[in-house]
Amino acid sequence: MKLNPSLLTAAGLVSAQLASALPQASSSTVSPSPSPSATPGSFVTTSGLNFVIDGKTGYFAGSNSYWIGFQKNNDDVDLVFSHLQESGLKILRVWGFNDVNQKPTDGSVYYHLLADGTATVNEGEDGLQRLDYVVSSAEKHGIKLIINFVNFWDDYGGINAYVKAFGGSKEDFYTNDAMQAAYRAYIKAVISRYSDSTAIFAWELANEPRCQGCETTVLYNWIESTSQYIKSLDSKHLVCIGDEGFGLDTGSDGSYPYQYSEGSDFAKNLAIPTIDFGTFHLYPSSWGTTNDWGNGWVTSHGAACKEAGKPCLFEEYGVTSDHCAVEKPWQNTALNTTAISGDLYWQYGDQLSGGPSPDDGNTFYYGTDDFKCLVTDHIAAINSRN
């Protein structure tokens, strides 16, 4: 999801400002914290077209929270995970990146400083130690995390943060040796902290990687080599791409998302042996399609995943209004489509110590009518199916 700052609620901004106003902690010179110890459970695996979580095979639901790793109040983090656990949601996708080109002076959280051709991982209390706590709380509450390593969009730095530090263009990121070396060093730094944690659902290459106008071989080669690298560091966890599902002949109506103009070939990329499952997103209003069109998008990807012999995760979907009326049919379609083994709505909202969590326009909040419709009732349907 590409965030729209103008849609953040005032309360959400206040919450973020309160978090960033806390005193700055130590910087990248601090030694890494030890990986949070694993609680009883098991590593997530796949079985045919299904996911297996803690020994249970079936369909699982979850959500996205780009902001949780940037919170400085541990109680807020624990509150979110306790509500996820209570509601029956099992997976949370979080930003594992927060790239900056200049070190913040206000004490705000950042993970990775990219400047003047160099890259420094922030392992301090205002850096990856915040992600440490997210992983630790997820372990305690039995929630599984998808952690990604970079953003295609400029929110929280993204690929353009690398471009500003090393030169070139966003398209160059996938093939530039210097940018890829910095990216891989960051991947290694993150994975080394959590490789033994059963809270990790999967490592994800990026949020919505695109290469507009590129041959599909550019993304393919990058996905293949990067996923191989991740597996060389950690063979215990699943690996996925984090793509939107663009570039697909199966079920195609010729509309923009099915085309290959963003440099992605969904089926070809999914066939890479070191990619364990498929990911796809759904935002009709951003793609020039209709809400009803989304049901075909879901079934098309289910068919492609079935053909590949791997499960699919309906990883992001959202609208800015009428959440229940619009998103419920998508959930039902996903739940009843072979090879779709889970869905994560965009995005989770809760009441934190400083006010409501950020609202990018697609958020709905814990305890609301929309939450009952799209979480409580959805979990009941999943439990009935499983």
Swiss-Prot record:
Subcellular location(s) per record: Secreted
EC number(s) from the headed UniProt entry: 3.2.1.78
Signal peptide: 1-21
Active site, per annotation: 208 (proton donor), 316 (nucleophile)
PANTHER family named among the record's database cross-references: MANNAN ENDO-1,4-BETA-MANNOSIDASE 1 (PTHR31451:SF39), PTHR31451
Pfam (any one): Cellulase
Keywords: Carbohydrate metabolism, Glycoprotein, Glycosidase, Hydrolase, Secreted, Signal
Protein name from the UniProt record: Probable mannan endo-1,4-beta-mannosidase A
Annotated residues for binding of substrate: 95, 207, 283, 346
Stated family: Belongs to the glycosyl hydrolase 5 (cellulase A) family.
Catalytic activity: Random hydrolysis of (1->4)-beta-D-mannosidic linkages in mannans, galactomannans and glucomannans
GO cellular component: extracellular region
InterPro entries named among the record's database cross-references: Glyco_hydro_5, Glycoside_hydrolase_SF, MAN-like
Main location: secreted
Recorded GO MF terms: mannan endo-1,4-beta-mannosidase activity
Any single GO BP term: mannan catabolic process
Function statement: Endo-1,4-mannanase, a crucial enzyme for depolymerization of seed galactomannans and wood galactoglucomannans.
Upper lineage: Eukaryota, Fungi, Dikarya, Ascomycota, Pezizomycotina
Sites carrying sugar chains: 336
